[in-house]
Design a protein with these regions (language model features):
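Active-site capping/gating regions of soluble enzymes
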Residues: 1-3, 10-12, 16-188
């Protein structure tokens, strides 16, 4: 069983139809255009591999009513390259143990939340994508965020719109995860 969908077996116990959700992760790119290209390329590869094996695949946000939908959580952060060549994560605070995010990082999340109603039509542009954003399926249902109760422990609330992702020992890992996109969101 994956995402609340049970595999369909025939009377001999052989799989007749398998319904599963697969999660695909890849390393981020410092180039936003390359990141969008990677996402599109991954979708094409998955579709072709399934087709070559006689299987169907869908990237719909809510292919089956009553079970968890398909999200495409998008992580974003901002880095600067100093004259010395060193990369600095602009969302990381100076003291990772005392603060959750830098003032720029807090400003970024505040701007996203404030303007999300204007941004959302580009993210959730179909009825199918809006069907995914319902209570009870670990999808965002409100325009809210949570940075966690303590800088050492970010929130893992799966119903928030945008969450803070960080590693207290790695300032370069600080970023936000926007949870509302789906596989048909235009990443570009």
């Amino acid at each position: 069983e994956v995402g609340g969908v049970k595999a369909k077996l025939d009377e001999d116990g052989h799989e007749a139809v398998v319904l599963e959700q697969l999660e695909i992760d890849w390393k981020f790119s410092n180039n936003p255009l390359q990141t969008a290209d990677n996402e599109l390329q991954a979708r094409i590869i998955v579709r072709e591999v399934f087709r070559e094996n006689g299987l169907d695949v869908t990237f719909n946000a809510k292919p089956i009513i009553g079970v968890a939908g398909s999200g495409e959580h998008t992580h974003f952060g901002v880095m600067a390259k100093l004259k010395s060549g060193k990369l600095v994560n602009l969302f990381s605070p100076e003291d990772m143990r005392k603060e959750s995010a830098s003032s720029l990082g807090i400003g970024a999340i505040m701007g996203l939340l404030k303007h999300y109603e204007a941004i959302n039509p580009f993210i959730s542009s179909t009825t199918d994508s809006l069907n995914r954003l319902k209570p009870g399926f670990e999808a965002p249902v409100c325009i809210v965020t949570s940075l966690g109760t303590d800088p050492s422990e970010p929130s893992r609330n799966r119903t928030i719109l945008c969450g803070l992702i960080r590693d207290i020992d790695n300032p370069m890992a600080t970023r936000y995860e926007l949870r509302s996109p789906n596989p048909y969101t235009n990443t570009y």
